[in-house]
C-alpha cells in the first residue's frame, strides 16, 4: 500500500498467501524503512493531480525522484513521528478538505456512472480546488499548512539487502508503490509524517479543521471514542497520509528501486545477489510521480469505488486491504467525496494498506460510521496512532534505525522490517505483530468488532453501491486512467531500473495493495473458509490485478476499487454469513491478507503457483466477479480488467466483455475495466516511450476501452482476461525476479538491458496476449497462457507504473475526457493527445486519444473486434474509423493498440500500433522526445489510419481486413496455440513466450522500458532507438501515434514470436506490418522503422530464445541462424525479415543480451538487416558454445549486464572466460533457481555452452568415455568449470578460453608447465580406457560416471589434463579424491576436481601419491568398499594420467593406489566397485609400500591396459625430483610426488579414506621417500608405518572425520611441506613423502605442539592419524594447521591455504573440517599452491616472497601434507562449482576476510566443512617460515572455511574448484566479476572464517561431509 508499514504488514499477509500458494520459500524480509522525507508539499499537488503528466513531479522529481536518500536519508520513523505532527495537522486538514471535496466528488460519483467524464472533470476540479484532494492520507503533511513544502515524507524504504533475500521483492516494491501511488504528488510530498503521535493534536486539529468529516468522526468515535479513535484514526490516517501519500512517493522511489529489487527477489536467484540489485535499484528508484499519479487519481478512483461501494465496513476493510492508500484523506476527496463514509473507510483502508488497513480494520467498524465524520481528524489521529504503532512495529520488527534508511542500503532494515514486519507480524503473529506494529491488537479487535457490526453493512452498502460502483467505475475509470498513470508515475524513468513486474505490482501498490489486502483479507477468509479457496486464489488473481493496476494507475485505482469489490464481493459472497467473524478475520486477516495480497500479487507475478491458483480459482474469481457483479462486481471487474490489462493487450476488451456480461452494472464498470486494460497497455507503452511513464497512453485508452468495452465485454472475456492476467502476473514477477537474481556484476546495466528487453517482450506479450484475449473474447475462453500473459503484462504493468506520472497526466486528460468519454470518446481521444502534450506525455496523449477512441469503439464492438481492435488500433488507432463497424473495429483496435502498444513495446508485434509502441519503448530514455514523436506519429496515424490498416494487412503478410488481421495478429501474438500455421509457430513461440515472456516480462519488469532494457543490454540499441524513434515517428507520423515506433517494437515481437521459427503468421505479420508501416507510412521514418523493428526483432528473438525452450532451439540454430532466419524460432519462419532478425537474434541470443541488441539497434538505425546482421555477427563471435549458455544468462546475467558487457559484450571471446565463470555459476547455481522459478528450460543451453568447453576439454585431452559424455551432461555444469579449466590448459580455444577467463587463466600457466610434463599418451589412453570401461560404462560405478557427467566430465577433465600435463591430471585426481565422500551424486567428479586441485597445488604430488596409495589400499581394506572405491576411480584415472604423463615409469610405482583411498571414503555405491579396483591395486600399492617400487612402475605400466588402466589410475608414478622441482618452479600444483598427482588422494569421504590413504601412503611414501631420500625429512618406514598404522586406525576411527584429509595434512605437515605441495621444489617434493612421514613421526613420537611449524604442519596432517590413528600425530595435528586443513580436506581442500592452515590448526581428523579450518596459516600456501595450479594468480595473492616459493618452496612436507590433503580434498571439489558457488563465494569471502594470509588469497574454494575436497590444491609454496607465520591465523581461517564451506559450498562445486587449481584461480576471476559464489578463495581472508570453526571442532568425516552436504 501507500504506507510502508502497512505494506510490510501486507507483505506478511502476502507472504502468508504465498505460503498458501506453496511459496514458503519466500522470506518476507523486506524491511520497509519508514523514511521521513521532507518533501516539498506545495499547493501544487492539485496542479500535479490535474497535470499529472506534466507536473506530476513538481516536488516529487526533486524530492521523490531526487532521492529519498539525500533528502530523507536519516529521517527515521521517529522523524516521521515528529514530522507526523505537522503532517497530522496539515495532512489531516487537507484530509478534511480533500474529504470534503471528495465527498462532493463522491456524491457526484454516485452519479458518476452517468457522469464519468463529469467525475473526472469534477475530480480534476476537486484537485484544482484542493491540491491535496487526491489521497486522503496523502494529505498528512509535515508542513503545518495544507501544502507545506519541505515536509517530511515518511515512507518505509525497502531494505534492499532484505529485498535481495526476498523472493517477494515485488511485494515490497508493491507496498511502496502503493505508498507512492496512492498519494498525489503534493500529498505524497505532504503525507510524510502524520502517524507517530497516536493522539497527535495537529492530526486531530487537521481533521477538525478540515471539518472532521464523517470519516474522521467515525474513525474517532468508532475506534476509541473521539479522542482515541481520532488518535488511532488520525494516526492511521496520518500513517495513511504519510504512508499513503508519502509511501506512494517513497514507494515511487522505492517501488522503482524496490520493484527492480523485488524482481530480483522474485527471481530468488541469490539472496546475496539481491543486495547488489538493491543498490542498483535504489538509485533508479524515484519518488517523483508515483505516489502522485498512483495515489491521487488512483486514490480518487479507488475512493470513488469505495464510496460507490457503500459497504463501508467491508469495503473499508477491503479497502484497508486495497484502497487504503488512496482513499484516505487525500484520495477520498479526490476520488469520491460523495461516498464520504465509504471514502473515509476506504481512505483509512487505502492509506494503511497493510498496517493502516489493520489498524483501520480495528477501527473501521467504529470508524466506518464515524470515519466519514471524523475521517480527516480521526484519520489524522488514526494515522498518528497507526503510524505510532507502525513506528513501534518498525522498531520492533525492523530494528528501527536500520529500517529507517533502506535507501541508505540498510540491508538489515529491510531484513528486520521485512522479515519481522512481514514474518512476525503476518507469518508468525499477525495480530501480535499488529500489536507491536502501528495498530495495536486492541484497536484491531475494536475495528474487528465494529467491522463485525459494520461489515455486513459494508457489503450491503457495496451492493447498494454496486450501481454507484458502476458509476464510480466510470468515474474511477477516469481516475484510474489518471491513477493508472499514477502507476506509471511510479514507473517514471526510474521505474525501468525497477522490474517491470515490480512495476506492475508496485504500481498497483498503493491502491492495488489495498485491494490486494482486501483481496488477501478475502483470501485469508477464503483460505480459512473451505469455500474461500477459490476466492482466495481469485484474490490472488486480484493481487495480480493489483499489479496490473499499478501497471496503469487508472487500472491501479480501478483495480484497487475492483479489488475492493472483489473483496467485498468475495467477502459478501463468503463471509457475509459470518460477517462478524469475517470482519474480525478481515480485521485481523485483512492486515495479514493485505500483506498476503501484496505478496500474493507478487506471487501472482512471481509464482506459477498463483497461476495454478488462478487456474483453480480464476473461474471462481470470475464467477465471484460475476456473482458479485450485482453487488460490487464492477469494481472487481475493473480489478479483473486491470489484471488483464498488462497481460492482454487485446484481452482487456475481452475481459471487459466478460465482466460486462457478468455484471449488472456492466456498462460503466466494464467500460472502466476496459479502460483499465487499455490503460495498462498504454501505461507500459508510455513507460517505454517516456522513460518509465509513457504507459499512461495505454492506461487512458484502456480505461476508455474498458469503460466502453465494459458494456460489451462478456463475462467469458472478463474471465479470460482475469485468468490470463493472473497467470501472467505470476510469471512476470517470477521471470522478472528471476532475471534479477543474477549475481550482481553490474545489475544496473544488466537490469537496464534486461528490463528494456523484457519490456519489449512483455509488451509483445501484452500484444500477443491481448490478441489472444480478443480472440478469446470472441471465443470467450481464457487460456492459461493468456492468464500467464496477463501476469507478464502485469509485470509490464510495473513498467507502466513507472510511467505513472504520464498515466496520471493522462488521468487528468481522462478527467477532462471522462464526461465526453461516453459521449465522444474519440473526440476526447483527439483532445487528449493535446492534453498529453499539456501533461508532457505526448505519446501518452496520443495513447489517450487512442484510448478514448478505443474505449468508444470497444464499447461499440469490443468482443467482436477485439482482434481487429489490435490491428485497427495499430492501423488506424489515432484515427477513428469512419464507419461504425470500422470505427468499432478501429477503436477496439485502438484500445488493443494501446494494449498492444505496450506489447509491441516489448514484443514489437507487427501491428501498426507497434510503431506507436516503439517510441513508447524508446521513451525509456527519450521519453519526452518519443512522446512528441509519438504524438506526431499518432496524429498522422489518425490521418493515415486507413493506410495503416492496409499496411497492417500487408505487413502481416496477410492482406486481410483489420478484423482478420487483428485476429491473426492476436492469434500470433496473444494466443499461444493458434490454428494458422504461423500461429502454430507462434503457438510454440507463444507457449514459450507464455513461459519465456514471463521471464522476459520479469526482466522488463525491472521497471525498464524495452528500450531502456535494450539500452542496458546495449546502450546503442536504446540510444539508436530514440533516434530511430524520431525517424520512426516521422514514418509513424502517418500513424500519428508512435506507430512507427510500434512497428519497430512489432519487429521485436516478430523477433520473439516470429524470429523463432520464422515468426508465426501473426508475428511475421506484425513484424512485416511494423516494417511495412515503418517503410510504407513514411519513407525516411520507414527505413528507420524497419531498422528499429529489426532491432526490436533481434531483441525479441534474443529474449525469446532467452526466455524459454527456444534457447535450446537457438542452440541448434545459432550457427545457421545468421544463414537461416527461422530455424530457432519456428514461430514465424515465413518472413525472411524475421529470419534476418532471427539470425541476428539467434546469433545475438547470447550476445544480444549484452551486445547483439545494441548491435542490432546500431545497425538497425542504418539498416534493418545491418542491425540484425551486426547482432548476428556478434552472436557468431560467440558461436553456439556460449549462446545457449547465455540464454540463461540473459535472464540471470542480464542483471549482471556490466559483467556481460565487460566480458561478453566486449568481444565475449576475450572475456568469455570470466563470463564463463559467471555462466557456470549461473547455470549451476543461479540459473537453476532462475529456470526453476521461471520454468525456464534454458538451463540446458547454458549447460550445453559449458559442455562445449567440456567438449573442448574432452577433445583436447579427454582420455576416457567421459570425453563423449560432457556435451550431453548438464550435471557436469559444475564440472564444466573444472573441466573447462582442464580444457583451457589443454586447449585455450574459444570454449575453454571462454571459461578460462573465469577459471582457466591459471590453466594457462599450468599449460606451460604441462607442456613440459604433458601426460603420456599411454596414460591418457589408459585413463580413457579406465573411464570408458570402469567409470563410464559401469552403472554400478555410476557415481563416477554420473559425477563426471554431472560436473561436466571431471573424468574428462582429468583425461585432458592428463594429456596436457601431469598438472592437469593432478587437479583431476585431486578432485576425485576430494569428492570421494560426495561421489554418490557427483562427488567423484568433485573428488576428481579436488585431486586435480591438489595436483594443481602440487602439494606433495609424489608424496601424496605414495602416501595415499598405500593408505588407499589399506583404507580400502579397512573401510567399506564403497568408500574405498569411490575416490579410487577418479584418482586412478588422474593417477594414470599423471604417472603416464609425467614419469610414467617412475610414477607407475609411486602410490598408484593411493587414489583408492581418496575415492574409498566418498561414494557409497560406486565406491565399492572402485574400491575393488583399488583393492586390487591396493595389493600392488601395498606391495609398493613394501618397497616394490619397480612393481608399482609395472603396475602403472599395466594400468595402461584396461586392468592397468584402473591400476594406473590407482598407481602413482614417481615424479622425479627434477620433475617435481620443475613443476613447482612452474608454479603448477605439483601433485606429482613420484611423478604422480598422489596428493590428490585426499579422500573427501570419511576418514576411512584417510586410513586407507595412510596405509597406501606408507607404500607411496616409501616410493616417495626414495625420492625424498635427498630431503630425508622422514623415514619412509616411519611415514609408512605411522601413516598406514596410526592413520589407518585414525581413519577407521575417523571415517566420518576425513582422516584422508588429515592424512594429507600429515603430508603437508609443515607449511613448507604443504607449501611444497604447492610447489616448493623437487627435493622438497621428494622430502614431502619423507617430511610427511617424518613430520608425522615427529608428531607421533614427539607430539610436537609446535606443529604449526612447517614440519608440524605435516604432523598436523598426521593429526588425522592423531585423532584416531596417530595419537602422537593427533596433538600436532591440532597444532598443525596444514594438517588440520588437509584433514578437513573437504573444507579446506578448495583452498590450498586452507588445507595448510587447517593442517596447522591440527587435529583435522578430529576436527573433521574443524581441523581443516585451521588452515589460516597456510592461506599463503593455499594461494601458492594455487600458484602451482595458477602460478600467476597465486603469486598475485601470495606474498612477493611467497611467489617465488610458490614454484620452488614446495616443501616435501607441504607436498606430503598436500598429498594427504588432496586425498581428503576430493569431496567438495567438483561440487562447489555446481550449487555452492554462491555459498563458496560467501564462504570464500568469509574465509578471505578472516584469513589474513597476505599472499594466499588465491585459495581455490572456501573450505566446506563437510566436504573433504575443500582442502584446496592451491597450497601456496611458501617457505616454512611463511607457513609458520600463517599458522597463527590458521584457526580463524579453518573456522571460516569450515563453516562457510559447510554451509554454503556445494561439495561438488568445491571439488570442482579444489580439483582445479586453475578453477581456484578462475574462481578468482569470479571474484573479480563480483561473483558471490565464485569468489576466489582468498586464503588471506579465509583463515578467520576457519578460525570460526576452530581447530577444536573435529567433526567426524560423516559430520563434516554431512554438514557440507547440508549446506550444499
From Swiss-Prot:
It comes from the Eukaryota. Keywords: Cytoplasm, Cytoskeleton, Developmental protein. The keyword Cytoplasm applies. Its main location: cytoplasm. One of its GO terms (biological process) is parallel actin filament bundle assembly. Residues 339-354, 489-498, 568-586 have a biased composition (Polar residues). Residues 355-374, 499-512, 981-990 have a biased composition (Low complexity). One of its GO terms (cellular component) is cytoskeleton. Disruption phenotype: RNAi-mediated knockdown results in abnormal bristle morphology. The bristle ridges are shallower than wild-type and become nonparallel and disorganized near the tip. The tip of the bristle is swollen giving it a javelin-like appearance. In 13% of animals the posterior scutellar bristles are fused. Residues 1-32, 89-145, 298-377, 460-515, 545-586, 764-920, 965-1010, 1257-1297, 1486-1507, 1881-1912 are annotated as: Disordered. It is found in: Cytoplasm, Cytoskeleton. Residues 772-792, 802-869, 965-979 have a biased composition (Basic and acidic residues). Residues 553-566, 890-904, 1494-1507, 1903-1912 have a biased composition (Acidic residues). Residues 97-133, 299-313 have a biased composition (Basic residues). Important for normal assembly of actin bundles during bristle formation. This is Protein javelin.
Amino acid at each position: 500500500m501507500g504506507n510502508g508499514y502497512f505494506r510490510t504488514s501486507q507483505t506478511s499477509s502476502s507472504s502468508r498467501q504465498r505460503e498458501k500458494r506453496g511459496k514458503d520459500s519466500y522470506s518476507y524480509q523486506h524491511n520497509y524503512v519508514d523514511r521521513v522525507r521532507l518533501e516539498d508539499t506545495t499547493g501544487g499537488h492539485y496542479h500535479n493531480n490535474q497535470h499529472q503528466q506534466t507536473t506530476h513531479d513538481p516536488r516529487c522529481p526533486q524530492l521523490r525522484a531526487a532521492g529519498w536518500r539525500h533528502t530523507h536519508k536519516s529521517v527515521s520513523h521517529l522523524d516521521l513521528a515528529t514530522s507526523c505532527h505537522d503532517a497530522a495537522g496539515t495532512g489531516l486538514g487537507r484530509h478534511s478538505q480533500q474529504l470534503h471535496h471528495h465527498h462532493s466528488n463522491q456524491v457526484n460519483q454516485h452519479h458518476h456512472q452517468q457522469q464519468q467524464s463529469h467525475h473526472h472533470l469534477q475530480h480534476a476540479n476537486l484537485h484544482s480546488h484542493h491540491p491535496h484532494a487526491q489521497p486522503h492520507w496523502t494529505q498528512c503533511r509535515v508542513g503545518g499548512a495544507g501544502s507545506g513544502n519541505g515536509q517530511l515524507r515518511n515512507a518505509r524504504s525497502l531494505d534492499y539487502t532484505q529485498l535481495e533475500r526476498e523472493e517477494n521483492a515485488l511485494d515490497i516494491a508493491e507496498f511502496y508503490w502503493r505508498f507512492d501511488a496512492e498519494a498525489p504528488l503534493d500529498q505524497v510530498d505532504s503525507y510524510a509524517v502524520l502517524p507517530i503521535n497516536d493522539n497527535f493534536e495537529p492530526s486531530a486539529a487537521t481533521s477538525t479543521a478540515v471539518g472532521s468529516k464523517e470519516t474522521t468522526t467515525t474513525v474517532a468515535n468508532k475506534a476509541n471514542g473521539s479522542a482515541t479513535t481520532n488518535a488511532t484514526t488520525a494516526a492511521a490516517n496520518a500513517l495513511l497520509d504519510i504512508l499513503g501519500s508519502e509511501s506512494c512517493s517513497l514507494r515511487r522511489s522505492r517501488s522503482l528501486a524496490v520493484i527492480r529489487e523485488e524482481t530480483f527477489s522474485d527471481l530468488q536467484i541469490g539472496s546475496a545477489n539481491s543486495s547488489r540489485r538493491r543498490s542498483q535499484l535504489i538509485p533508479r528508484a524515484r519518488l517523483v510521480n508515483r505516489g502522485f499519479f498512483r495515489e491521487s487519481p488512483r486514490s480518487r478512483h479507488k475512493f470513488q469505488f469505495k464510496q460507490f461501494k457503500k459497504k463501508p465496513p467491508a469495503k473499508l476493510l477491503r479497502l484497508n486491504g486495497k484502497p487504503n492508500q488512496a482513499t484516505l484523506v487525500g484520495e477520498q476527496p479526490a476520488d469520491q467525496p460523495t461516498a464520504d463514509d465509504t471514502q473515509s473507510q476506504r481512505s483509512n483502508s487505502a492509506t494503511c494498506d497493510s498496517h493502516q488497513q489493520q489498524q483501520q480494520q480495528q477501527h473501521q467498524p467504529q470508524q466506518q460510521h464515524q470515519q466519514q465524520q471524523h475521517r480527516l481528524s480521526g484519520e489524522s489521529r488514526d494515522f498518528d496512532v497507526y503510524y505510532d504503532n507502525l513506528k513501534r512495529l518498525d522498531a520492533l520488527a525492523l530494528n528501527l534505525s536500520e529500517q529507517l534508511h533502506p535507501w541508505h542500503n540498510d540491508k538489515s532494515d529491510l531484513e528486520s522490517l521485512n522479515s519481522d514486519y512481514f514474518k512476525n507480524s503476518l507469518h508468525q503473529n499477525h495480530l501480535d505483530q499488529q500489536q507491536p506494529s502501528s495498530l495495536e491488537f486492541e484497536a484491531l479487535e475494536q475495528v474487528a468488532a465494529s467491522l463485525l457490526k459494520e461489515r455486513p453493512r459494508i457489503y450491503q452498502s457495496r451492493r447498494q453501491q454496486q450501481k454507484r460502483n458502476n458509476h464510480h467505475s466510470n468515474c474511477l475509470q477516469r481516475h484510474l486512467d489518471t491513477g493508472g498513470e499514477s502507476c506509471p508515475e511510479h514507473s517514471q524513468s526510474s521505474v525501468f531500473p525497477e522490474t517491470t513486474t515490480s512495476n506492475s505490482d508496485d504500481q498497483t501498490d498503493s491502491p492495488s495493495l489495498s485491494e490486494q489486502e482486501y483481496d488477501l483479507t478475502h483470501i485469508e477468509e477464503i483460505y480459512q473458509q473451505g469455500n474461500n479457496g477459490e476466492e482466495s486464489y481469485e484474490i490472488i488473481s486480484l493481487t495480480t490485478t493489483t499489479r496490473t493496476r499499478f501497471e496503469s494507475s487508472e487500472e491501479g485505482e480501478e483495480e484497487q476499487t475492483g479489488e475492493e469489490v472483489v473483496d467485498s464481493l468475495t467477502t459478501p459472497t463468503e463471509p457475509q454469513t459470518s460477517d462478524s467473524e469475517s470482519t474480525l478475520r478481515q480485521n485481523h486477516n485483512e492486515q495479514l491478507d493485505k500483506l498476503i495480497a501484496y505478496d500474493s500479487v507478487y506471487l501472482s507475478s512471481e509464482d506459477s503457483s498463483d497461476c495454478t491458483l488462478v487456474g483453480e480459482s480464476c473461474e471462481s474469481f470470475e464467477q465471484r466477479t460475476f456473482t458479485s457483479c450485482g453487488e460490487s462486481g464492477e469494481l472487481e471487474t475493473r480489478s479483473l480488467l486491470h489484471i488483464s490489462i498488462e497481460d492482454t493487450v487485446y484481452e482487456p476488451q475481452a475481459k471487459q466483455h466478460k465482466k460486462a456480461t457478468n455484471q449488472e452494472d456492466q456498462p460503466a464498470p466494464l467500460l472502466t475495466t476496459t479502460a483499465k486494460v487499455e490503460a495498462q497497455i498504454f501505461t507500459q507503452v508510455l513507460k517505454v516511450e517516456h522513460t518509465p511513464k509513457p504507459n499512461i497512453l495505454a492506461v487512458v485508452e484502456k480505461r476508455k476501452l474498458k469503460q466502453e468495452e465494459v458494456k460489451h465485454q462478456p463475462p467469458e472475456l472478463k474471465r479470460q482476461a482475469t485468468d490470463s492476467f493472473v497467470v501472467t502476473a505470476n510469471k512476470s514477477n517470477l521471470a522478472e525476479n528471476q532475471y534479477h537474481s543474477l549475481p550482481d556484476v553490474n545489475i544496473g546495466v544488466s537490469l537496464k538491458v534486461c528490463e528494456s528487453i523484457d519490456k519489449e517482450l512483455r509488451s509483445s506479450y501484452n500484444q500477443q496476449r491481448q490478441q489472444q484475449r480478443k480472440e478469446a473474447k470472441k471465443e470467450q475462453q481464457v487460456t492459461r497462457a493468456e492468464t500467464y500473459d496477463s501476469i507478464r503484462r502485469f509485470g509490464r504493468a510495473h513498467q507502466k507504473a513507472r510511467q505513472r506520472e504520464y498515466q496520471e497526466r493522462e488521468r487528468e486528460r481522462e478527467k477532462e475526457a471522462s464526461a465526453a468519454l461516453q459521449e465522444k470518446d474519440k473526440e476526447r481521444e483527439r483532445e487528449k493527445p493535446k492534453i498529453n502534450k499539456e501533461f508532457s506525455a505526448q505519446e501518452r496523449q496520443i495513447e489517450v486519444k487512442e484510448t478514448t477512441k478505443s474505449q468508444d469503439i470497444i464499447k461499440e464492438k469490443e468482443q467482436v473486434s477485439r482482434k481487429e481492435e489490435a490491428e485497427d488500433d495499430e492501423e488506424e488507432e489515432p484515427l477513428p474509423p469512419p464507419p461504425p463497424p470500422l470505427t468499432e473495429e478501429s477503436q477496439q483496435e485502438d484500445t488493443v493498440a494501446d494494449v498492444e502498444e505496450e506489447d509491441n513495446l516489448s514484443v514489437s508485434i507487427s501491428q501498426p500500433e507497434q510503431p506507436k509502441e516503439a517510441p513508447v519503448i524508446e521513451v525509456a530514455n527519450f521519453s519526452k522526445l518519443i512522446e512528441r514523436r509519438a504524438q506526431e506519429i499518432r496524429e498522422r496515424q489518425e490521418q493515415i489510419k486507413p493506410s495503416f490498416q492496409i499496411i497492417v494487412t500487408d505487413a502481416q503478410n496477410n492482406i486481410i481486413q483489420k478484423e482478420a488481421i487483428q485476429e491473426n495478429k492476436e492469434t500470433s501474438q496473444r494466443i499461444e496455440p493458434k490454428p494458422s500455421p504461423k500461429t502454430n509457430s507462434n503457438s510454440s513461440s507463444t507457449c514459450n513466450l507464455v513461459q519465456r515472456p514471463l521471464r522476459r516480462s520479469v526482466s522488463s519488469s525491472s521497471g525498464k522500458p524495452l528500450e531502456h532494457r535494450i539500452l542496458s543490454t546495449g546502450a546503442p540499441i536504446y540510444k539508436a532507438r530514440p533516434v530511430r524513434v524520431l525517424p520512426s515517428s516521422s514514418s509513424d507520423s502517418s500513424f500519428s501515434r508512435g506507430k512507427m515506433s510500434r512497428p519497430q517494437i512489432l519487429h521485436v515481437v516478430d523477433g520473439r514470436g516470429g524470429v523463432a521459427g520464422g515468426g508465426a503468421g501473426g508475428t511475421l505479420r506484425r513484424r512485416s506490418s511494423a516494417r511495412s508501416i515503418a517503410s510504407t507510412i513514411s519513407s525516411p521514418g520507414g527505413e528507420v522503422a524497419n531498422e528499429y523493428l529489426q532491432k526490436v526483432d533481434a531483441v525479441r528473438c534474443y529474449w525469446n530464445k532467452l526466455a524459454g525452450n527456444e534457447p535450446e532451439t537457438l542452440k541448434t540454430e545459432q550457427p545457421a541462424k545468421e544463414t537461416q532466419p527461422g530455424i530457432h524460432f519456428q514461430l514465424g519462419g515465413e518472413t525472411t525479415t524475421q529470419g534476418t532478425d532471427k539470425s541476428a537474434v539467434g546469433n545475438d541470443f547470447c550476445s544480444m543480451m549484452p551486445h547483439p541488441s545494441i548491435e542490432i539497434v546500431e545497425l538497425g538505425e542504418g539498416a534493418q538487416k545491418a542491425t540484425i546482421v551486426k547482432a548476428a555477427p556478434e552472436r557468431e563471435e560467440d558461436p553456439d558454445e556460449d549462446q545457449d549458455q547465455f540464454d540463461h544468462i540473459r535472464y540471470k546475467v542480464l542483471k549482471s549486464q556490466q559483467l556481460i558487457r565487460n566480458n561478453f559484450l566486449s568481444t565475449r571471446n576475450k572475456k568469455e572466460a570470466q563470463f564463463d565463470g559467471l555462466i557456470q555459476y549461473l547455470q549451476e547455481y543461479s540459473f537453476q533457481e532462475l529456470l526453476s522459478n521461471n520454468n525456464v528450460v534454458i538451463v540446458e543451453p547454458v549447460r550445453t555452452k559449458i559442455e562445449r568447453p567440456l567438449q573442448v576439454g574432452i577433445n583436447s585431452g579427454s582420455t576416457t568415455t567421459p570425453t563423449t559424455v560432457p556435451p550431453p551432461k548438464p550435471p557436469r555444469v559444475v564440472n564444466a568449470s573444472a573441466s573447462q579449466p582442464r580444457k583451457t590448459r589443454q586447449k585455450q580455444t574459444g570454449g575453454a578460453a571462454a571459461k578460462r577467463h573465469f577459471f582457466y587463466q591459471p590453466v594457462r600457466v599450468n599449460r606451460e608447465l604441462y607442456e613440459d610434463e604433458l601426460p603420456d599418451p599411454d596414460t591418457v589412453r589408459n585413463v580413457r580406457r579406465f573411464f570408458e570401461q570402469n567409470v563410464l560404462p559401469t552403472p554400478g560405478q555410476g557415481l563416477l560416471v554420473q559425477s563426471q557427467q554431472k560436473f561436466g566430465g571431471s573424468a574428462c577433465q582429468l583425461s585432458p589434463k592428463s594429456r596436457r600435463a601431469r598438472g592437469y591430471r593432478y587437479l583431476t585426481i585431486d578432485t576425485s579424491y576430494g569428492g570421494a565422500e560426495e561421489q554418490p551424486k557427483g562427488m567423484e567428479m568433485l573428488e576428481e576436481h579436488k585431486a586435480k586441485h591438489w595436483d594443481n597445488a602440487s602439494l606433495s604430488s609424489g608424496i601424496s601419491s605414495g602416501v595415499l596409495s598405500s593408505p588407499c589400499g589399506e583404507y580400502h581394506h579397512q573401510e567399506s568398499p564403497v568408500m574405498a572405491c569411490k575416490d579410487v576411480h577418479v584418482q586412478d584415472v588422474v593417477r594414470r594420467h599423471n604417472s603416464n604423463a609425467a614419469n610414467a615409469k617412475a610414477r607407475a610405482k609411486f602410490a598408484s593406489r593411493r587414489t583408492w583411498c581418496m575415492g574409498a571414503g566418498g561414494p557409497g555405491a560406486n565406491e565399492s566397485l572402485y574400491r575393488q579396483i583399488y583393492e586390487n591395486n591396493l595389493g600392488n600399492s601395498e606391495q609398493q609400500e613394501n618397497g616394490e617400487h619397480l612393481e608399482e612402475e609395472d603396475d602403472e605400466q599395466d594400468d595402461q591396459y584396461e586392468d592397468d588402466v584402473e591400476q594406473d589410475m590407482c598407481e602413482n608414478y614417481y615424479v622425479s625430483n627434477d620433475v617435481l622441482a620443475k613443476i613447482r618452479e612452474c608454479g603448477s600444483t605439483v601433485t606429482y610426488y613420484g611423478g604422480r598427482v598422489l596428493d590428490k588422494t585426499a579422500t573427501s569421504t570419511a576418514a576411512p579414506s584417510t586410513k586407507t590413504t595412510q596405509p597406501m601412503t606408507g607404500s607411496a611414501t616409501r616410493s616417495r621417500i626414495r625420492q625424498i631420500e635427498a630431503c630425508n625429512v622422514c623415514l619412509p618406514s616411519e611415514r609408512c608405518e605411522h601413516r598406514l598404522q596410526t592413520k589407518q586406525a585414525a581413519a577407521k576411527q575417523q571415517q566420518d572425520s576425513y582422516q584422508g584429509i588429515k592424512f594429507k595434512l600429515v603430508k603437508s605437515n609443515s607449511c613448507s611441506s604443504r607449501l611444497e605441495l604447492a610447489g616448493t621444489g623437487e627435493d622438497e617434493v621428494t622430502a614431502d613423502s619423507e617430511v610427511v612421514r617424518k613430520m608425522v613421526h615427529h608428531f607421533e613420537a614427539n607430539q610436537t605442539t609446535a606443529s604449526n611449524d612447517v614440519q608440524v604442519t605435516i604432523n598436523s596432517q598426521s593429526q588425522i592419524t592423531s585423532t584416531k590413528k596417530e595419537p602422537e600425530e593427533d596433538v600436532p595435528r591440532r597444532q598443525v594447521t596444514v594438517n588440520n586443513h588437509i584433514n578437513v580436506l573437504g573444507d579446506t581442500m578448495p583452498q590450498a591455504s586452507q588445507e595448510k592452515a587447517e593442517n596447522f590448526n591440527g587435529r583435522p581428523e578430529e576436527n573433521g573440517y574443524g581441523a581443516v579450518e585451521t588452515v589460516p596459516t597456510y592461506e599463503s600456501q593455499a594461494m601458492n599452491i594455487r600458484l602451482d595450479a595458477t602460478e600467476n594468480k597465486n603469486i598475485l595473492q601470495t606474498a612477493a616472497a611467497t611467489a617465488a616459493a610458490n614454484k620452488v618452496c614446495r616443501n616435501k612436507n607441504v607436498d606430503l601434507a598436500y598429498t594427504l590433503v588432496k586425498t581428503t580434498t576430493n569431496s567438495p571439489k567438483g561440487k562447489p562449482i555446481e550449487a555452492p558457488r554462491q555459498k563458496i563465494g560467501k564462504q570464500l569471502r568469509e574465509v578471505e576476510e578472516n584469513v589474513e594470509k597476505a599472499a594466499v588469497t588465491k585459495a581455490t574454494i572456501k573450505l566446506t566443512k563437510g566436504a573433504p575436497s575443500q582442502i584446496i590444491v592451491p597450497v601456496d609454496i611458501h617457505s616454512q617460515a611463511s607457513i609458520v607465520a600463517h599458522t597463527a591465523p590458521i584457526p580463524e581461517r579453518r573456522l571460516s572455511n569450515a563453516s562457510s564451506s559447510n554451509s554454503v559450498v556445494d561439495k561438488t562445486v568445491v571439488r570442482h574448484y579444489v580439483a582445479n587449481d586453475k578453477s581456484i584461480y578462475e574462481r578468482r576471476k569470479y571474484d573479480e566479476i563480483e561473483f558471490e559464489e565464485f569468489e576466489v578463495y582468498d586464503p588471506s581472508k579465509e583463515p578467520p572464517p576457519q578460525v570460526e570453526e576452530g581447530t577444536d571442532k573435529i567433526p567426524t568425516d560423516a559430520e563434516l561431509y554431512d554438514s557440507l552436504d547440508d549446506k550444499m
